[in-house]
């Protein structure tokens, strides 16, 4: 895959992520903050971005979303077969809730 293709795919992922994040924040800010792992400050900014601003942000050559499963226990929980899918989801939510939110610091 060529470098220009990779950059285009990164931009597409960025735009899809920003559009989803903004929709989540506008529908239910508290739930969005939990699901996205962002602070109220970032959620407020996401909610107010115009379409032009979203497109400009998405044009970055850096991936804007962060892989949150950097904890071995959490990743193992999500990847191993569990007897109860509901319990697995609850356990994952508890582990994710322990992680600090992203802020503008």
Swiss-Prot record:
Its main location: cytoplasm. Keywords: Activator, Bacterial flagellum biogenesis, Cytoplasm, Disulfide bond, DNA-binding, Transcription, Transcription regulation. GO terms for cellular component: cytoplasm. It is found in: Cytoplasm. Functions in complex with FlhC as a master transcriptional regulator that regulates transcription of several flagellar and non-flagellar operons by binding to their promoter region. Activates expression of class 2 flagellar genes, including fliA, which is a flagellum-specific sigma factor that turns on the class 3 genes. Also regulates genes whose products function in a variety of physiological pathways. The C-terminal region contains a putative helix-turn-helix (HTH) motif, suggesting that this region may bind DNA. This is Flagellar transcriptional regulator FlhD. It comes from Cupriavidus necator (strain ATCC 17699 / DSM 428 / KCTC 22496 / NCIMB 10442 / H16 / Stanier 337). The lineage of its organism: Bacteria, Pseudomonadati, Pseudomonadota, Betaproteobacteria, Burkholderiales.
């Amino acid at each position: 895959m060529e470098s220009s293709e990779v950059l285009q795919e990164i931009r597409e992922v960025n735009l899809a992520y920003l559009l989803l994040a903004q929709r989540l924040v506008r529908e239910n800010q508290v739930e969005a903050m939990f699901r996205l792992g962002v602070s109220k400050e970032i959620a407020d900014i996401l909610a107010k971005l115009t379409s032009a601003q979203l497109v400009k942000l998405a044009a970055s050559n850096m991936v804007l979303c962060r892989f949150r499963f950097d904890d071995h226990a959490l990743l193992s929980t999500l990847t191993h077969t569990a007897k109860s899918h509901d319990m697995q989801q609850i356990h994952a939510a508890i582990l994710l809730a322990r992680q600090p939110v992203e802020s503008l610091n």
